[in-house]
Every structure is written in C-alpha cells, then in structure tokens.
From Swiss-Prot:
Family: Belongs to the DarP family.
Gene Ontology MF term list: ribosome binding; rRNA binding
Keyword RNA-binding included in the entry's annotation: yes
Keyword terms of this UniProt record: Cytoplasm, Ribosome biogenesis, RNA-binding, rRNA-binding
Name the record gives this protein: Dual-action ribosomal maturation protein DarP
Name of a matching Pfam family: DarP
Cellular component annotations (GO), alphabetically ordered: cytosol
Reported function: Member of a network of 50S ribosomal subunit biogenesis factors which assembles along the 30S-50S interface, preventing incorrect 23S rRNA structures from forming. Promotes peptidyl transferase center (PTC) maturation.
Subcellular location: Cytoplasm
Length: 183
C-alpha cells in the first residue's frame, strides 16, 4: 500500500497517538504468489468436481458459471480459465468453500474405509462361517441370520465351482444395507 502525500503528515514523530488499525502489514511478493497459486489449485479442484458435488459447495453465480465454463473448455483455454477462477477466488472469502470441499473429501474417505471393512467382513463370513455370523449379529442385531447363512453357503459353492461370485456380491450389498440403516 503506497502512501499519498497527504498521509505523510500523519507520520509526524511527535505524534503520540497510535492507531493500531492503520498499521501496515508487509507481505512479500513471493507469499502473494504462493497464495495466488494455492487459490488456483483450489479452483482446479472445484473444476474437477462433478455437478452434484458442486451443488453442495457455497458458490456465487459468477464463480459457478466460470467453473462450469472451465469444465467444458479444453487445453490452453482451460489454463486461462483456471487463472480467472483463481483471480475470482482472491476476491472472495474462500474459507466456506474450503470447508465444504474438505467435508466432501472426508465423506468419500470415510466411505472407502467403510467399504474396505465390509469387504473384509464378507471374506471372513465366507471363510469362517458361523463364528463370523455371530459377530455380524452382535454388530447388527436386526440382521437376518437365515438369509446371511444362505448367502454364505451359496458363496462357498460358487467359489468351489469357480463360478462368478454373485452371492459374495450379495453378501457385501446386504452388509452395506445393514451399515447404512444403522447410521
């Protein structure tokens, strides 16, 4: 921020009144460039999101239009559009956008972890049988023991006969339904 000639008089050394709001914070040019580059990366993440995910992020109309345009553009035009989005983000409060984006990423990561746990449980059900069924019933007391045993029996037969794992997929789907109904 450069000072105008009329502001020079405010810096008289004998002036004991200091206004803390007028304090100038010096920021290096490199830091400004790093911040701009970070906002450009945030803009690129927003462009890579799908329409449903974008609906969950608080964006104003101008920024949303710029993002949708960048999604349609290819090559060099896309790079220029990403720079424009970065510039638009510099003029806005990006904290709500970052929080919504982190929330989306976190939800996806939690879902992946849940799916891995359910796959592991499904494999244990097929290998161990009744011991693992008892564990499933302790996790989800409303689970149907008879249906689960039937699916496990069919999955074992399919595995022995080198058939496609249709029942194993059904076990996974059933476990996923139980987990979704719980939460």
């Amino acid at each position: 921020m450069t000072k105008q000639p009329e502001d020079w008089l405010d810096d008289v050394p004998g002036d004991d009144i200091e206004d803390e709001d007028d304090e100038i914070i010096w920021v290096s040019k490199s830091e400004i460039k790093r911040d701009a580059e970070e906002l450009k990366r945030l803009g690129a993440e927003l462009v890579d999101l799908g329409k449903n995910a974008l609906d969950k992020i608080p964006l104003d109309a101008d920024l949303r239009d710029a993002i949708e345009l960048a999604q349609r553009i290819k090559m060099e035009g896309r790079r220029r559009q990403l720079q424009l989005i970065g510039k638009m983000l510099r003029q806005r409060d990006v904290e709500p956008i970052r929080q919504a984006l982190d929330k989306l990423k976190n939800r996806h990561n939690q879902q992946v972890v849940l799916f891995h746990k359910l796959e592991h449980l499904r494999d244990r059900l097929i290998v161990e049988g009744d011991d693992a069924v008892a564990e499933v019933l302790t996790l989800w007391p409303h689970a149907d023991r008879q249906q689960l045993r039937s699916l496990i029996r069919n999955a074992k037969k399919e595995k022995e006969g080198n058939k496609p794992p249709k029942s194993a997929r059904q076990i996974f789907q059933y476990l996923r339904e139980l987990a979704e109904n719980e939460g």
